[in-house]
A protein has these predicted regions:
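Intrinsically disordered, low-complexity terminal tails and inter-domain linkers enriched
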Residues: 2-14
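N-terminal small-domain helix-loop-helix segment of the aminotransferase-like
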Residues: 14-108, 113
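Residue-level marker for buried hydrophobic side chains located in beta-strands
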Residues: 47, 203-204
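Conserved core of the PLP fold type I
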Residues: 72-198, 204, 209-216
Length: 216
């Protein structure tokens, strides 16, 4: 038994050695990044995370438990499962088909995938600032240059600054949160249209908070 314990100890890697390996192999710019901060929401309504502070009614919990028990959760979902979900979303939103629908595990994953899709040498991603922190984080992790364009003091879009930045940097991807996070305001629709017309790259209108604004 003593030999086994000695082998286990010899095979263990100390936290200090792991930290040294991380420092040696992980990109320096990634090491300098700050983690996404989640504030304490005790006794608060988390509008920023779109969380309901109240639990589901007992009857609905029981119904969900029955449906979950009937699923083969030991298997990955099939393509048909995703198709059915897309069709349900298309019906709900009045879409003609499902070809334009992409599903993700929350917006963070979709933002990350979009940043990776445009990650070519010299590519640039742009967004107003301040805005959702994951736009810049997704760009940095993908190794793509990020250009923040400051909002006006009243948090409205600086249309001239945005158009000038678009002309200068020719971004492959522009993120516009509508309504904006964390400022909570809707940008002027004419300003948004001007950005759409001026950009030859992809423009993402992030409408995660549209329910608070009475629609898109």
């Amino acid at each position: 038994s003593g030999g086994g314990a000695h082998q286990a100890a010899a095979g263990a890697v100390s936290p200090a050695r792991i930290a040294a390996r991380v420092e040696r192999h992980v990109r320096p710019d990634v090491q300098r990044m700050a983690a996404y901060h989640v504030a304490d929401a005790t006794d608060a309504i988390k509008l920023d995370a779109m969380e309901n502070p109240w639990r589901l009614p007992g009857a609905l919990q029981a119904e969900l438990a029955q449906r979950l028990a009937a699923l083969a959760i030991n298997r990955y979902p099939s393509g048909n499962t995703y198709t059915a979900l897309k069709q349900a979303i298309a019906r709900h939103d009045g879409l003609d088909g499902i070809d334009g629908l992409v599903l993700g595990n929350g917006s963070d994953e979709l933002i990350s995938l979009l940043c990776q899709l445009v990650a070519q040498p010299g590519a640039t991603i742009m967004a107003p600032a301040p805005s959702f922190v994951m736009y810049e984080m997704g760009a940095r992790l993908a190794g793509v240059g990020f250009v923040p364009v400051p909002l006006r003091p009243d948090f409205s879009l600086d249309r001239e600054a945005m158009l000038q930045a678009i002309e200068t940097h020719r971004p492959a991807l522009v993120f516009l949160a509508y309504p904006n996070n964390p400022t909570g305001n809707l940008f002027d629709a004419d300003d948004v249209r001007a950005i759409l017309q001026a950009t030859d790259g992809l423009v993402v209108l992030d409408e995660a908070y549209a329910p608070f604004a009475g629609g898109a």
